[in-house]
């Protein structure tokens, strides 16, 4: 599963999910993409589950790009702990996703295969998503 090798600080504030994605909202690498339509935290386990589902469906063909990275640590307190005594220990990692963000990109497969693979991956996500096809002029390298 994805997680940072090291970070400057172990614990972060929760923050807010206001607005739409201004970066990472265009198809850059592949021909097909899965785009988020809602704001959410996506855990490293969910990202990995989506990746596995897509690679299994596409079999040998195709290349897959994961466009999000879980760089925010989420802390949790042990169960039945009294209030106070500081913030809990980092438990898992999430990627902060806003509407419009591209989650995955794919190329080297037909549109029907890509659409089906992305649909399976979308079931693993906690948000609504949409399937995108890059136009000829939109791909930048």
UniProtKB/Swiss-Prot annotation:
Q: What is its main location?
A: plastid
Q: Which CDD domains match?
A: Ribosomal_L16_L10e (cd01433)
Q: Which residues cross the membrane?
A: none
User: Which one GO biological process term can you cite for this protein?
Assistant: mitochondrial translation
Where does the source fall among the domains of life? Eukaryota
Identify the keywords attached in UniProt to this record, alphabetized: Chloroplast, Plastid, Ribonucleoprotein, Ribosomal protein
Q: Which GO terms describe its cellular component?
A: chloroplast; mitochondrial large ribosomal subunit
Which residues does the annotated region (Disordered) include?
A: 1-20
Keyword match Magnesium: no
- GO MF term (any one): rRNA binding
Where do Basic residues bias regions lie? 1-17
Cellular compartments annotated: Plastid, Chloroplast
**Record-linked InterPro entries:** Ribosomal_uL16, Ribosomal_uL16_bact-type, Ribosomal_uL16_CS, Ribosomal_uL16_dom, Ribosomal_uL16_sf
> Assembly and partners?
Part of the 50S ribosomal subunit.
User: What family is this protein classified in?
Assistant: Belongs to the universal ribosomal protein uL16 family.
Question: PANTHER family, from UniProt?
Answer: 50S/60S RIBOSOMAL PROTEIN L16, LARGE RIBOSOMAL SUBUNIT PROTEIN UL16M
Q: Record's HAMAP family?
A: Ribosomal_uL16
Q: What is this protein called?
A: Large ribosomal subunit protein uL16c
Species in which this protein is naturally found: Staurastrum punctulatum
**What is this organism's lineage?**
Eukaryota, Viridiplantae, Streptophyta, Zygnematophyceae, Zygnematophycidae
